[in-house]
Amino acid sequence: MHKIFSKNNLIFFVFVAFIFVVIVLQFFVSSENATKVNLSQTFEPISWLHLLGTDDYGRDLFTRIIIGARSTLFVTVLTLIAIVVIGVTLGLFAGYKKGWIERLVLRFIDVGLSIPEFIIMIALASFFQPSLWNLVISITVIKWMNYTRLTRSIVNSEMNKPYIKMAQLFHVPTRTILIRHLTPKIIPAIIVLMVVDFGKIILYISSLSFIGLGAQPPTPEWGAMLQQGRDFISSHPIMLIAPASVIAITILIFNLTGDALRDRLLKQRGEYDESH
C-alpha cells in the first residue's frame, strides 16, 4: 500500500512540476521570436543563445516549442471543457429521464463509437478551413460520447439508492437532484477520464496539425512543427526530434497521472487490486 501511495505521490509531483515549468517558461520567452523570420540565422546549431538551435526561417526552436505549448494546451483545455459540458449534460438527462431521450442518445453513441475516432475527426476537419479552432469542433463532436456513456452508467447505478428515492418521494426538483445529488457522484470518474483524455487530445491535435488540418504557419504548434521538421529529418533532425519528444513526454505524464488518479479512486471505493 505504501508503494502505491508513494508512486502516486511521485506522479502527482511530476505532473504539477511539469505544469509549473510550462507556465513559468512563458514569462521568459517572447512570442515574437517564435514567428519572426531571420534568414541570417537559419539552421543555427544548439548553443546557449539557441538551446535547440534555429529552424529554416531562423526562428528559435526552444521558443517555438514553449509558445507552441500555449497553443496546444489551451486548445486541449478548451476542447475538454466543451466535451465535458456536452457529455455530462446529456448523460445526466439520459440516465435520469430514461425513455426516448435515453434510447436516442444511446443509439447515436452506438453509431458514433462504431467508427474509428480519428477517421471521423479527419473527415470533419476536412470540411472546415484548417485552424486550431476547427479542431476543437471536430474533436468535440466525437469525444463527448465517452463522457455521456460514463455519466449515464453512474446515474443508473445511483438511481435505485435510498437518497434518490427519498428525494423523488418528497418532490425535490429534478434540477436539484441532478446538480446537488448526482453530479458530485460523477465528478471523480469524470476527472480521471479528463486527465487520461488530455494526452489523447494532444495527440489528436498534433496529428491533425501534422497532416495540415490544424494550425497553419507561422503559428507555433507542436504538430505543425513536426510537419515542418519532417522535411529536414536528414540534415537537421532536431527540428523533428524536439517537438516529437515534447509531445511524447507530455502524453506520458498525463497518462501516468490518469492511471494514478484511477488507482486512488478505486482504492477509495475498496475496489483496488493489491497486485496492480
Swiss-Prot record:
GO terms for biological process: nickel cation transport; transmembrane transport. GO terms for cellular component: plasma membrane. It is a multi-pass membrane protein. It is found in: Cell membrane. Residues 69-258 form the ABC transmembrane type-1 domain. PROSITE patterns: ABC_TM1. The chain crosses the membrane at residues 10-30, 73-93, 108-128, 186-206, 238-258. Belongs to the binding-protein-dependent transport system permease family. OppBC subfamily. The complex is composed of two ATP-binding proteins (NikD and NikE), two transmembrane proteins (NikB and NikC) and a solute-binding protein (NikA). Part of the ABC transporter complex NikABCDE (Opp2) involved in nickel import. Probably responsible for the translocation of the substrate across the membrane. NCBIfam families: Opp2C (NF045474). This is Nickel import system permease protein NikC. The gene is nikC.
